[in-house]
Amino acid sequence: MDRHITAPITKETAKTLHAGDYVYIAGTIYTARDAAHKRMQETLQRGEALPLEMKENVIYYMGPSPAREGRPIGSAGPTTASRMDKYAPELLDLGLGAMIGKGKRSQEVKDAIVRNGSVYFAAVGGAGALLSKCILSSEVIAYDDLGTEAIRKLQVKDFPVIVVIDSEGNNLYETAILDYKRES
């Protein structure tokens, strides 16, 4: 089923999404990769405020290439999500609405998604140039010293993703394998 949603993503919206749904996101999302996640964890350990509010926001695991003239961003393909698994449960517990990446997630992340009524989306790896066409603007908002891994605020329109883990814990990567085996 194709869905069009607007970020930030509320728990109510997350509940309507199901593993396997094709979703087009409009609105504001943020980027963060390994180094930014590590720095956010260190910030929380010091008892300081994060550079962005987690509640209902979307983090896209992506570090863009340089923008061509006239474009807000360069190639913007997803990063392997499992690299953020040690940080994700804490951010989900702070209210993170959704994550976008590629690949499988740990059981701890899946449990945190269910516990918090969140969702994990996958974007197509290798399609970064095409995905960048859905990004209307890009602004570094934190950790500028991290270069491509700085946290960016993106405005997106019709950004294509697939629900991999929904708020009930259904996991497309697991169900698709079972469906394939039944068909074989």
Predicted stretch roles:
Residues 88, 164-184:
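Active-site/ligand-binding-proximal alpha/beta "capping" segment
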Residues 17-18, 73:
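Short, polar loop/linker segments at the starts of domains and inter-domain junctions
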Residues 31-32, 36-159:
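Feature captures the catalytic cores and cofactor-binding loops of soluble hydro-lyases/lyases
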Residues 1-9:
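Short, structured beta-strand/loop micro-motifs enriched in basic residues and often containing a Trp
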Residues 11-16:
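Short, surface-exposed secondary-structure edge patches
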